[in-house]
Amino acid sequence: NTALYPLMGIEVGTTVHFPMTTQELQAALAKIGIDGKRYSEVFFTSFDSDVLGLYDHLYECENIDELNELGHALLEVRDKGGLETFEAALVLGNHTRSVKDLINLTQNLDLYRFYPDISDDEGLGRLYADELGTIDIPEHIQNYFDYEAYGRDVRINEGGVFAPGGYVSAVPEGFKEYYHGPQDIPPEHRIFAYPEKAEPVHSILAALKRFQEAPPAPKKDKAGPSHEER
């Protein structure tokens, strides 16, 4: 709730998950006192995502409907097996300056060449020379060929980068702008609507006070190793 911070010096907020429904959004807005009358503005204090690096490209005043559209677009990318390519494209850094760019990026992933598990110039050189056949190396000099230098030249010429999941580069031309702004969001993905009734501010503040004054929870014994730790 944007208004309560300068007035009272506290952040009154809640966590939401995209994509979401209008009903879920209204419940979240009501919880922090947003009714569209006395209080109507919201901002985001932080982002988190299973999509590696996505939160670095999101900002506090993002449009809620656009974030929801991005959420739906990313689900579609995931279902098509393209999340690693999208994550690598974020590292490449083209078309990542706004949510509008990110939505368009999800629809242009066919322009990106992504090779998983390629993490250095030598590996890239071997991939291009031995597997993709981009250069003919006579058999009698293969043991002396500088794959690292060749891979470096490939990377520089393509403008590619090594991302956490592999190597990525993009076709220089052909990126299309399918999404031009909120007017292009399908009706079923437009969720923003104020709730009919919001939680009174005094109730919110009382709940915060109770939380702040509550004794700390007792420490539990350390649990056994998680699945990831094993």
Where are each of the predicted segments found?
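Short, flexible beta-strand-to-coil junctions
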Residues: 1-7, 46-49, 168-171
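N-terminal ordered "arm"
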Residues: 1-38
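Short, solvent-exposed secondary-structure boundary motifs
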Residues: 6-8, 144-152
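A broad, low-specificity signal marking well-ordered, structured residues that form hydrophobic/aromatic
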Residues: 14, 42, 166, 228
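Alpha-helix initiation and N-capping motif
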Residues: 22-25, 121-122, 147
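Mixed-charge (acidic/basic) macromolecular-recognition segments
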Residues: 31-143, 172-201
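Non-Sec secretion/translocation targeting segments of pathogen effectors
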Residues: 146, 201-230
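Short, surface-exposed polybasic-aromatic patches that bind anionic ligands, especially phosphate groups
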Residues: 148-157, 161-164, 172, 179-181
